[in-house]
Amino acid sequence: MSTEQELQIGKVVKSHGIRGEVVVELSTDDPDIRFAIGEVLNGKQAGKEHSLTIDAARMHQGRLLVKFAEVPDRTAADSLRGTRFFAAPLEDEDDEDGFYDHELESLRVIHEGEDIGEVTGVMHGPAGEILEVRLTSGKETLIPFVHAIVPEVDLEEGTATITPPEGLLDL
């Protein structure tokens, strides 16, 4: 299955400890299913593909630590930095009101009828998602992805309309 049909579910941020664990930045609402012991993940990194089997996964200080069967030590874990994991959508992931990161990335950002920039990424935090936007001026800004600030996303038109509070775009 190609990554166009799959969803990114996480990304290796760095190694952790000396036993080959890695810190995974999650981009799934189902880490207990996606990162269950015995699951085989499809990883992609700089044109290389990896199939990695989960030996253990645990939360530690708000981060997911994963140990893969194929990764014996820190050196091997370090080599996985930047690896992105992809998987087919789960059957219950047809949320009418939700969006996947890949659907939001590259949307044009519209404010008061004007194209002011492009969504370049989506950050996931404890308080919710934040859109990373490159403004037409070249500046980068962050916009909370909440209905009050982003009231309309039109995937067919490729736009996200924003109504930011005063000063948000001036930062």
UniProtKB/Swiss-Prot annotation:
Keywords: Chaperone, Cytoplasm, Ribosome biogenesis, rRNA processing
InterPro entries hit by this protein: PRC_barrel-like_sf, PRC_RimM, RimM, RimM_N, RimM_N_sf, Transl_B-barrel_sf
One of the protein's GO biological processes: rRNA processing
Broad class of the protein's primary localization: cytoplasm
GO MF, one example: ribosome binding
UniProt domain comment: The PRC barrel domain binds ribosomal protein uS19.
Functional note: An accessory protein needed during the final step in the assembly of 30S ribosomal subunit, possibly for assembly of the head region. Essential for efficient processing of 16S rRNA. May be needed both before and after RbfA during the maturation of 16S rRNA. It has affinity for free ribosomal 30S subunits but not for 70S ribosomes.
Cross-referenced PANTHER family: RIBOSOME MATURATION FACTOR RIMM
Protein name, per record: Ribosome maturation factor RimM
